[in-house]
Amino acid sequence: MLTDSDKKLVLQVWEKVIRHPDCGAEALERLFTTYPQTKTYFPHFDLHHGSDQVRNHGKKVLAALGNAVKSLGNLSQALSDLSDLHAYNLRVDPVNFKLLAQCFHVVLATHLGNDYTPEAHAAFDKFLSAVCTVLAEKYR
């Protein structure tokens, strides 16, 4: 559960994230490189570095996270449709959400540098863990 302090840190981090609109695509590229088995969920995508399809999907990832940041008090409702899509239509193994979250942390650390303090990292990790949990809810 996110404390008020965590929520404040998440909002502060997010204000910096939105200055880097390619963070989502970078996280996806890192995901595909580090965990190549995740490519199986994107058979119709050009997965090469700089691909328009990866860049566009990265924008969708960032938009979904932005929606979650705006709805920190009710993530389940904010992410319900996305959870349905991934569970029932796309049938994405929920472990992949955690893998993407790890990749997102690396991208944030790369772009934010010293602004991604241990406290900010811990709060954002709680946030991403909560997002992963909500996205996996429909699998039960």
Swiss-Prot record:
Q: In which tissues is it expressed?
A: Red blood cells.
GO CC terms for this protein?
A: blood microparticle; haptoglobin-hemoglobin complex; hemoglobin complex
What keywords does the record list, in alphabetical order? Answer: Heme, Iron, Metal-binding, Oxygen transport, Transport
Region forming the signal peptide: none
User: Which GO terms label this protein's molecular function in UniProt?
Assistant: haptoglobin binding; heme binding; metal ion binding; organic acid binding; oxygen binding; oxygen carrier activity; peroxidase activity
Write out the residues that bind heme b.
H57, H86
Instruction: Fetch the InterPro entries from UniProt.
Output: Globin (IPR000971), Globin-like_sf (IPR009050), Globin/Proto (IPR012292), Hemoglobin_a-typ (IPR002338), Hemoglobin_oxygen_transport (IPR050056)
Q: Is DNA-binding tagged as a keyword?
A: no
Q: Which Pfam families match?
A: Globin (PF00042)
Give start and end of each Globin domain: 1-140
The reply on keyword Phosphoprotein is: no
Q: Which domain of life is it from?
A: Eukaryota
Its GO biological process annotations read:
hydrogen peroxide catabolic process
**Subunit:** Heterotetramer of two alpha-D chains and two beta chains.
Q: What does this protein do?
A: Involved in oxygen transport from the lung to the various peripheral tissues.
Protein family (similarity comment): Belongs to the globin family.
Protein name per its UniProtKB record: Hemoglobin subunit alpha-D
